[in-house]
């Protein structure tokens, strides 16, 4: 299982992976979780996909997308502040240049690759490691997100607990919560599954191009 980063300049080249990503989001958020999301041509999209985010994808066998997340700098419009301000204790996000927002995180847990540490799916831990590694490589040390109580528990089990930015709020058919997470070496080492391949360096330790 490998991590692929797709920055705006790579959208066209990685279009087939992005189509898979949108289909995976439709399956997880629309069909499985029954969230109120917009699905068109089999894929889930929203207005934040129009803001040139970077996507983190977990791929299996070099072809199948089994995990994804969207990253946006909070200095611009973000899902947390514009769509879910009720999750923030102050109603607004005190953004810094060292902060990145992650949203639309999901994994295909039907993949028969077994469970990794703490009985979490390998795709989940691979995605966590990829998000933290990309964040550190691009100068971010804090990740903010809006999620639900179920996923908050998953983060804690992974050894990457979230600090809440407000109280949980019932939204639709779920209970949502906002929080921030550290993007540092200690967190990366806790979540990193065996066999993880760095997205920052090649096999000889040479740095690869930034995904930002």
Curated annotation (Swiss-Prot):
Q: What are the alphabetically sorted keywords of the record? A: Autoinducer synthesis, Conjugation, Plasmid, Quorum sensing, S-adenosyl-L-methionine, Transferase
GO MF terms listed in the record are: N-acyl homoserine lactone synthase activity
**Superkingdom of this entry's organism?**
Bacteria
What EC number(s) are associated with this protein in UniProt? 2.3.1.184
Q: Which cysteines are joined by disulfide bonds?
A: none
Q: What catalytic activity is recorded?
A: a fatty acyl-[ACP] + S-adenosyl-L-methionine = an N-acyl-L-homoserine lactone + S-methyl-5'-thioadenosine + holo-[ACP] + H(+)
Pfam families with a match to the protein in the record: Autoind_synth
Q: A GO BP term, please?
A: signal transduction
- PANTHER family found in the cross-reference section: ACYL-HOMOSERINE-LACTONE SYNTHASE, ISOVALERYL-HOMOSERINE LACTONE SYNTHASE
**What family is this protein classified in?**
Belongs to the autoinducer synthase family.
What does this protein's UniProt record list under function?
Required for the synthesis of OHHL (N-(3-oxohexanoyl)-L-homoserine lactone), an autoinducer molecule which binds to TraR and thus acts in the control of conjugal transfer.
Q: What is this protein called?
A: Acyl-homoserine-lactone synthase
**What is the organism field in this record?**
Rhizobium radiobacter
